[in-house]
């Protein structure tokens, strides 16, 4: 893991911090996500609160935060892992983002490692994600972690010219999430 960074799950009570970090990610890299800062800024606070509250008890979600291990505990990145609603043996990774000041320090790799450990712990057989085709650093990270291209690139959202490459990683266990 990156020195000076710890990876943990968001607590349900941390929805304001999750909201702030998510909106920061959308503003920093608007081309990398299927949503936009404008859309999510309009969400009612109750929706943000409910999202993390549901994730904390579902057993099918793992919202992760990377934070400085020092006294400031500044949040430096996030990644959400979630069981596919139609196939409990598949975990999808989304909302991956690392703050510019923390990039190149192993934070993204640590977030992915934690998400993969969670996926293995719930007996998932496959992990899927989509990565913007122009984000070569992220693509190389996922390839180093064992992901492979899993289909043809497609628009990241309807009407977008930006393409997203689907990727997948087979896990050794072959049972469904409980």
What residues fall within each predicted segment?
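Acyl-donor-binding surface of acyltransferase catalytic domains
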Residues: 1-10
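C-terminal "cap" of GNAT-fold acetyltransferases
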Residues: 125-126, 132-178
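Active-site acidic-Proline motif in GNAT/NAT acetyltransferases
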Residues: 99-101, 105, 133-134
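Short coil/turn segments at alpha/beta junctions that flank glycine-rich nucleotide-binding fingerprints
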Residues: 105, 121-125
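Conserved phosphate-binding and hydrolysis motifs of nucleotide-dependent enzymes
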Residues: 77, 106-108, 146
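Acetyl-CoA-dependent GNAT
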Residues: 12-13, 19-20, 24-101, 112-114, ...
């Amino acid at each position: 893991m990156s020195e000076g960074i710890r990876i943990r799950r968001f607590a349900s009570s941390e929805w304001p911090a999750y909201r702030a970090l998510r909106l920061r990610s959308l503003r920093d890299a608007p081309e990398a996500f299927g949503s936009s800062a404008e859309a999510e800024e309009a969400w009612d606070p109750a929706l943000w609160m409910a999202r993390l509250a549901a994730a904390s008890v579902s057993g099918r979600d793992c919202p992760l935060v990377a934070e400085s291990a020092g006294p400031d505990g500044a949040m430096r990145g996030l990644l959400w892992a979630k069981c596919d609603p139609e196939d409990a043996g598949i975990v999808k990774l989304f909302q991956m983002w690392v703050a510019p000041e923390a990039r190149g320090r192993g934070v993204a790799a640590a977030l992915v490692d934690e998400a993969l450990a969670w996926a293995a712990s719930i007996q998932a057989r496959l992990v899927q994600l989509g990565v913007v085709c122009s984000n070569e650093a992220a693509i190389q990270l996922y390839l180093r972690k064992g992901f492979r291209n899993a289909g043809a690139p497609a628009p990241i959202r309807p009407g977008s010219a930006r393409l997203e490459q689907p990727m997948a990683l087979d896990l050794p266990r072959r049972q469904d999430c409980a």
